[in-house]
Amino acid sequence: MDSLDAFATGKLDALEAGSLRRKLVPTERGSGAAAARRGRALVSFSCNDYLGLSHHPRVIAAAQAAAASHGAGAGGSRLVTGDHPYLGALEDGLARHKGAEAALVFGSGYLANLGITPALAGRGDLVLLDELSHACMWAGARLSGAQVMTFRHNDPGDLAARLAEHRPHHGRALVLTERVFSMDGDRAPLGDILGIAESYDAWTLVDDAHGIGVVEDGPRAPLEMGTLSKALGSYGGYLCASRPVVDLMTSRARSFVYTTGLPPASAAAALEALAILEAEPERRARPLALARRFTARLGLPEAESAVVPVLVGEAQAALDISAALEAAGFLVVAIRPPTVPAGTARLRVAFSAAHDEAQVDALAEAVAALTGRA
């Protein structure tokens, strides 16, 4: 057997050969859309801070006050001593915002999805998820022990066909999808999906990580999870559902039970960001408007969310364009397999209320020149 280092080196060499090796790049984020890498000042179009709230003075002040009064960390699982008052207040706010009976805060969006599905499904059950669902939805589905199947991306007809064929042979059934897909920026036909799931006696879990605060119109699912780290500018995850479901998660979602509670500063920051989000509808409308300005200038399909993919194809080509954009003063990270399917490496452009029109137009001009769309 190879030594541990030899094994790791071999794997790294293979990744390097395919332009798929990941490396950390220290990045300093400033207010607005400002960023810095390798000593170069940049305008960032790769951050998920869709409403620019992570640097909002009120959000920062709320975090500072919470840390000063309740400490830097929760100190334990929420079921032991880590259930500080900010968590309950945040859960009340999230439930109200989503029109749900209750909410539960997790340590991250990944941890939420890792815990929700296994608490609801197991052996003998069926989990159907959109083929482009986020990795954490896949992880939770596989961890559940249920039979896991996919349906074609945003295809209600294929979902119905799979449920018709497989639902009779299973106990419980869950359908998993996203309101806004993180790498393509398109939106699920939730009305159709929810109707089909209900007709086959299946529960629907929607990941709203990239929708909350930006595009939230449309029907609500019985299970809606999301993150506090994007439009809300903080860190953490949550589930909004009925009170019995939330109470079940409190006892059975292992990624909740066996994890230290979210730090007071993170919870307080998210709570303050939620208040700003609800009070400033013009802030919420801006990311989508800027995304559509960008797609119009490049002749791309009209943006459906704050996320716009510019497909390139091969991983190295995407890396090269990203590097050229950085040299021109823009931070637009290349997204490569396995995050996206092979042959679909892309620039993932994320728009924020902190951007201005001149920055968007300048990026569109640079991307057009580098991708042959000029």
From Swiss-Prot:
It is an enzyme of class 2 (transferase). The modification N6-(pyridoxal phosphate)lysine is found at residue 230. Substrate binds at residues 22, 29, 134, 339. SUPFAM superfamilies: PLP-dependent transferases. PROSITE patterns: AA_TRANSFER_CLASS_2 (PS00599). Pyridoxal 5'-phosphate binds at residues 109-110, 182, 207-210, 227-230. Pathway: Cofactor biosynthesis; biotin biosynthesis. Its cofactor is pyridoxal 5'-phosphate. GO terms for biological process: biotin biosynthetic process. InterPro entries: Aminotrans_II_pyridoxalP_BS, Aminotransferase_I/II_large, AON_synthase_class-II, PyrdxlP-dep_Trfase, PyrdxlP-dep_Trfase_major, PyrdxlP-dep_Trfase_small. It comes from the Bacteria. Keywords: Acyltransferase, Biotin biosynthesis, Pyridoxal phosphate, Transferase. One of its GO terms (molecular function) is 8-amino-7-oxononanoate synthase activity. Its EC number is 2.3.1.47. It catalyses: 6-carboxyhexanoyl-[ACP] + L-alanine + H(+) = (8S)-8-amino-7-oxononanoate + holo-[ACP] + CO2. Catalyzes the decarboxylative condensation of pimeloyl-[acyl-carrier protein] and L-alanine to produce 8-amino-7-oxononanoate (AON), [acyl-carrier protein], and carbon dioxide. Belongs to the class-II pyridoxal-phosphate-dependent aminotransferase family. BioF subfamily. Homodimer. PANTHER family: 8-AMINO-7-OXONONANOATE SYNTHASE (PTHR13693:SF100), CLASS II AMINOTRANSFERASE/8-AMINO-7-OXONONANOATE SYNTHASE (PTHR13693). This is 8-amino-7-oxononanoate synthase.
